[in-house]
C-alpha cells in the first residue's frame, strides 16, 4: 500500500519529479489562462461605451492580474520560467475578437463573448485539475480560486445578456 510512503521520507525520486512537473504545468496553465482573460478584456474594453460593462471588465481584469502575479511568484519559487501565451495564440484570439465585433459592438454581444470565454476558462481549469493530480495543495488552491472566479465571471456576464 501507499500508507508508509506518504511522509515524503521514502518517496521514490520519480514521484517527487512528477510533483514538480505537475506543479509547474498547472502554474503555467494558470499563467496562460489569466493572461488570455486579461488580454481579452483589454481588447474589448476599448470597444464599449457602456460604463457598467466597463466597470465589470476592470474588476475582472484586476482579479486576472492578481491571480497571474501569484502564479508568476509560485513559478519563481520553484525556479521555473513563466511561459505566457504565444504570439500566435494572442494573434488568433485578437483576430477572433475583431471578426466577432466588427459588425456588432453591443453590450449584449460583448457580454456573450465574455461569458463564453469564462466558460471555456472554467473547462480549462477542470481539465488541468484532472491532468496534474500531483500538484501541491497550494497550487491546486490557486487553480480552484481561478475556477471559482471564472464561474462567477460567467454569471456576471450573463447579467448583461
What are these regions (language model features)?
Residues 9-10:
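Aromatic (phenylalanine/tyrosine) cluster motif
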Residues 30, 37, 44, 67, ...:
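Amphipathic alpha-helices that form helix-helix packing interfaces
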Residues 16-48, 109-133:
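Alpha-helical bundle segments that constitute or directly flank the non-heme di-iron/ferroxidase center
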Residues 52-88, 157-161:
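Conserved alpha-helical segments that form or flank metal/cofactor-binding pockets of metalloenzymes
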Residues 22-30, 51-69, 107-114, 136-150:
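Alpha-helical scaffold segments that form or flank carboxylate-/histidine-based iron centers
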Residues 110, 117-161:
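Preference for long, well-ordered alpha-helical segments
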Residues 69-122:
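Carboxylate-rich helix-loop segments that flank metal/cofactor sites and access channels
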Amino acid at each position: 500500500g501507499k500508507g508508509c510512503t506518504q511522509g515524503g521520507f521514502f518517496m521514490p525520486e520519480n514521484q517527487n519529479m512528477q510533483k514538480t512537473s505537475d506543479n509547474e504545468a498547472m502554474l503555467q496553465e494558470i499563467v496562460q489562462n489569466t493572461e488570455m482573460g486579461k488580454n481579452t478584456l483589454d481588447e474589448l474594453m476599448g470597444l464599449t461605451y457602456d460604463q457598467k460593462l466597463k466597470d465589470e471588465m476592470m474588476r475582472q481584469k484586476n482579479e486576472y492580474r492578481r491571480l497571474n502575479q501569484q502564479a508568476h511568484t509560485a513559478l519563481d519559487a520553484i525556479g521555473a520560467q513563466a511561459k505566457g501565451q504565444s504570439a500566435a495564440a494572442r494573434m488568433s484570439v485578437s483576430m477572433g475578437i475583431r471578426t466577432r465585433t466588427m459588425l456588432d459592438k453591443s453590450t449584449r454581444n460583448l457580454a456573450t463573448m465574455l461569458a463564453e470565454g469564462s466558460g471555456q476558462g472554467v473547462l480549462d481549469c477542470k481539465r488541468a485539475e484532472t491532468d496534474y493530480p500531483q500538484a501541491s495543495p497550494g497550487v491546486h488552491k490557486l487553480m480552484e480560486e481561478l475556477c471559482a472566479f471564472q464561474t462567477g465571471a460567467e454569471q456576471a456576464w450573463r447579467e448583461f445578456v
